[in-house]
């Protein structure tokens, strides 16, 4: 998720339809979005943790997904078979969503 601000992950999870509106904050507080939770989200810690290289954020997200799907990520999500990268740019005027899968996982 493109979480350049703390609230962004919560908004994104709800806007993308993963969690019902008004419930994403409680999911995060309960650990349900942790790497071992019901809906692992940003196991690297997201943009706030690893940095926000404007213009290269999407490449970083895809790299992280590839490592997850290959089973080589330091914060590996157990049984990762599919991943979603969500990125924003240009003050919210550009949005991309990429879905990657490892059929051999």
What is each of the regions a protein language model found here?
Residues 1-105:
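Claisen-condensing/thiolase-fold acyl-transfer catalytic domains that form or cleave C-C bonds
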